[in-house]
Amino acid sequence: MKQYGVFDIIGPIMVGPSSSHTAGAARLGLVARHLCGEDVRKAVFYMHGSFAETYAGHGTDKALLAGIQGIRYDDERLKEAYALAEQAGLEAVFVPADLGAVHPNTVSMELTTKRGRRFTMTGCSIGGGSVCITELDGVEVTFSGERPILATRHTDEPGVIAGITAILYAYRINIGNMQVKRSADGKAACMYMELDGELPGQLKDALERVYGVKQVLLLCPEDIA
């Protein structure tokens, strides 16, 4: 049986009225910001269930918008998310949507970076500020954000994934969950891993030196705590 801490029950100290609709939403935005890896020019948020019904009144829209700008749920700037987005040239659109048989506090994001790259993420706020990520760039995942997440973009050829996992083995880092997606033309791929334990500071540099690796993104729990 899972043991619950006090912050799982009463939620974190935050800006806004609801840990599910504000703190959790801001954390979802922060996850998207980190795993997108670039500044965002446009964000479309497809709001499902209770998110769709109450996002304006509970500040869910501000929290999501703050998160993708790198603003935490306990930062007073969350209240100014729209003004800060306008200053940064960030366009945001919120669309009520039926995403199917998913958690009522679910949002699907389509982010377009300033370089024109498209990134998608779907996740839900499950209470007390906790979140669950269910999709990254079209890849089905189940990540909590409570363990480190490694995202790589690399060439789609033999040996690249082996090179990445060899580095993880060298640092004695265990892979808890792994998903890979290939591009339609077979030239590129992306990979998402949930890892166990703390990550050494030199890990990112070591992974970036692997043949075929084009980008390495690391999200640690403290980045969205």
Walk through the language-model features, giving the residues of each:
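Acidic-glycine-rich active-site phosphate/pyrophosphate-binding loop
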Residues: M1-V6, G37-K42
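Alpha-helical scaffold segments in soluble metabolic enzymes
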Residues: D8-I9, R27-L35, A63, G67, ...
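Conserved phosphate/anionic-ligand binding catalytic regions in large, soluble enzymes, centered on
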Residues: G11-G29
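Generic secondary-structure signature for well-ordered alpha-helical cores
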Residues: V15, V31-E38, Q69-Y73, Q87-E91, ...
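A structural-propensity feature for long, helix-poor, extended segments
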Residues: V44, H48-Q87
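Short glycine/threonine-rich loop-to-helix capping motif typified by GTGT followed
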Residues: T54-K62, P104, C190-G197
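C-terminal edge-of-domain segments
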Residues: E86, E91-M121
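A conserved regulatory-domain signal marking ACT and ACT-like small-molecule sensing domains
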Residues: F94-A97, M121-A225
